[in-house]
Design a protein with these regions (language model features):
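Conserved short alpha-helical segments that host acidic/polar catalytic motifs at enzyme active sites
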Residues: 1-237
Length: 237
């Protein structure tokens, strides 16, 4: 698979929706993840990321404007031991709870399907990073309707063992803007990963569509020690 520019990929798409990037820093020292949310409606744009323990949760920026919390208020990031879970919905909790009971990432996600927001049927995208004694691997998943048919759920898992320095994979909910919104197709995109946490955070944030971007979370985890650094950027301040 040809590696593409994450900056170009983001800049060329006004509405990828929600997106997860997972990979390894160019110097090979850090496990890297980014999660962003975008919005077209007032309800969807009325959000910020806030820290919550070792993870984050979404929160209404202006509680008086919150019309429907069901699919927009959740914990995108949670940490279970040496595993970091990143998703675009409350399946974060499903993965956390079932993996805590010794089930696998894939088994946990078999209990879930795409979101019930007809006619988009937004895919549920998820990622998990596992860091153990200086080793690092990750997996990504997408649960989506069968070409807009809600009677059938298609589940795909992609696992990346011993990832290469300077490479990441990018998955997002929608191919592009539209009505209804077309679900992501294919396997996660191979993108280059350069620079430190601040450089990478700026690259993602600056290339997301100005009108539609809402919040961004970035974390660099030291593969040797498990210690991490986090950046959160919110459009609403």
């Amino acid at each position: 698979m040809k590696s593409i520019s994450l900056a170009n990929e983001l800049a060329g798409n006004s509405y990828p929706g929600r997106g997860i990037v997972i990979g390894k820093s160019a110097d090979g020292k850090y496990a890297v993840t980014a999660y962003f949310i975008m919005g077209r409606s007032e309800n969807s744009r009325n959000r910020v990321f806030v820290e919550d323990g070792e993870g984050i949760r979404t929160q209404a920026f202006d509680p008086s404007k919150l019309s429907d919390p069901s699919l927009i208020i959740y914990a995108p990031v949670r940490v279970l031991g040496n595993k970091t879970i990143v998703t675009n919905g409350d399946q974060t909790d499903t993965i956390y709870e079932l993996m805590d009971k010794q089930q696998t990432f894939e088994q946990a996600l078999r209990t879930r399907e795409f979101e019930p927001d007809a006619p988009n049927y937004t895919p549920r995208i998820s990622g998990i990073m596992h860091i153990d004694n200086g080793t690092y691997n990750y997996a990504m998943s997408i649960l989506k309707s069968n070409n807009g048919n809600p009677d059938s759920c298609n589940r795909y898992t992609f696992a990346y063992q011993n990832p290469v320095a300077g490479e990441a994979h990018f998955i997002h909910t929608y191919m592009e803007d539209g009505n209804p919104l077309p679900s992501f197709e294919g396997e996660p995109k191979l993108v280059g990963l350069e620079g430190d946490i601040d450089t990478f955070t700026s690259l993602v944030w600056e290339n997301l569509n100005e009108e539609n971007k809402v919040s961004l979370f970035v974390r660099y985890i030291d593969i040797e020690t498990g210690k991490y650094e986090t950046r959160i950027v919110n459009k609403n301040k």
